[in-house]
């Protein structure tokens, strides 16, 4: 009996030629995909350590030429870098937290049938996706409400995003209604159900919204140009943009 089991394990553990071919094919495909994903980062890196004139003329292809590290020395010795890095980190962290809360909490409210006018307010928020306020109206609005040339001009305008709201609402609607009904029978109120039931079950979509918000906050530098004038409010991306312009 033991011998048969051992032979069965050996037989199961062996791979046929077809299995090996499939494994090799999958490995090659994923290897190529990995190279495609990594190459942009590699290309950027070799450009940073190559001769600037060669980079500007497009003569750098696969390998660096005229290797030097002056670009890194220049960036790391900038006095504007530490405060700009702090501003970028602060806006990314705070902006992401506020955005996640502002997307998930109203989304949960919009899924509740007992609230009057929920469909109207939901459509009112969603319809803003199809219209742009324009640069001048936004500038005047920010100055009127007092956030122009302040740190909060990075946070407040991006708190409520219709796209994130739609994502959260769609996901929350897919959760089993019986879970919330059971919590309601046990005496859980609206806030208790939101914080102790909905949020834990919505971790996947909250992570997605967090990534979208964090990447958007970190990469955005145009609002620094348009809505701030103090150097203390400059973000890391704006400082790097200025360095890039100066090197051209």
Question: Where do the language-model regions lie?
Answer:
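A hydrophobic, multi-pass inner-membrane permease signature
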Residues: 2-247
């Amino acid at each position: 009996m033991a011998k048969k089991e051992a032979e069965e394990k050996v037989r199961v553990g062996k791979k046929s030629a077809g299995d090996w071919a499939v494994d090799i094919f999958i490995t090659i495909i994923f290897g190529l995909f990995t190279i495609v994903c990594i190459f942009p980062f590699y290309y950027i890196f070799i450009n940073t350590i190559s001769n600037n004139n060669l980079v500007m003329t497009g003569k750098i292809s696969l390998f660096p030429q005229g290797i030097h590290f002056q670009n890194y020395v220049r960036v790391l010795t900038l006095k504007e870098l530490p405060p700009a890095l702090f501003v970028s980190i602060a806006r990314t962290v705070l902006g992401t937290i506020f955005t996640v809360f502002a997307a998930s909490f109203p989304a949960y409210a919009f899924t509740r049938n007992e609230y009057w006018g929920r469909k109207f307010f939901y459509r009112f928020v969603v319809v803003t996706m199809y219209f742009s306020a324009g640069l001048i109206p936004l500038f005047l609005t920010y100055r009127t409400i007092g956030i122009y040339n302040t740190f909060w001009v990075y946070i407040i305008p991006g708190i409520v995003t219709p796209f994130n709201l739609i994502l959260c609402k769609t996901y929350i609607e897919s959760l089993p209604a019986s879970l919330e009904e059971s919590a309601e029978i046990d005496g859980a109120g609206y806030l208790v159900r939101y914080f102790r039931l909905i949020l834990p079950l919505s971790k996947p979509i909250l992570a997605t919204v967090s990534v979208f918000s964090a990447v958007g906050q970190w990469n955005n530098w145009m609002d620094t140009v348009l809505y701030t004038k103090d150097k203390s409010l400059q973000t890391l991306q704006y400082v790097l943009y200025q360095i890039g312009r100066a090197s051209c």
